[in-house]
């Protein structure tokens, strides 16, 4: 099979060639350590601060409020654990949703072991949180609410502005994991009343190894890494300048091209969804029909296993997934799909297709041509035809 089609952009994206070019000088010519006082160090320091400005501009933040990390997992850990530990005298209660990324869920479990109380909010059948449920969950001693902006699994976009307004009114910090939405749809941390926000480079055509945590000025947060005091003392470690420069370039590109990319991907996504539902009996859309990321299509099929579909598609040159690559080694049903009310067998029969800015209509057409026979053959093998 020579044809190779990539429908797994939510797992990771290829690096934009413009990003690669921006990074190159910082491997050999401009290789300094940002903490050094000499020319090479100051050259790197300047690149760092210019990068901070570019990342901040994408979400209407102040440059000083951007803390660079090595991954979204690190940023999410810093947000939850850092805020909880810094504010434990004020209270020991946090609120998260039932559809968070595994690194948020695991951080919350760790905090429970340290004596913190965690409230997990349920979602409706589309994966949406009711902001009023957030209001009800906040109580005396609540220090943080963390709700994912857009689901990495089903693409549903949460009413972040409404949740942020409630948290601000109640005097509680509000964090959102915006890894999937950052660079794809507009975000304004001020209008949305966001206090902390997680973003990742490799989900938006930047390199792996760079991410950020927006921390609004005045938020009390403790570092998890101690050492040289880099990143305003919140993230000690030698700064990975090439990756951060690449991340910043990806942000600048996204700022210019976001609207066009969203429109193009949304059109192809809609064609894909309509084509599947029309051509494959016993197929259904998971998540919200309209209030979802422009590049996400999560579908389920009666009588087949999602992993079997992936293997068969891969043999035909199509790369897809059943969900987060960070937890794909686990055989349990996807927790997000269970949270929206699917039964175990329905969750196991789901397929996530995520498009990117280089996805072509011809690739959608090829997928729609191949899929019906794949599903039919798998159902025949399983005796569900």
Give the predicted meaning of each segment:
Residues 1-385:
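Pyridoxal 5′-phosphate
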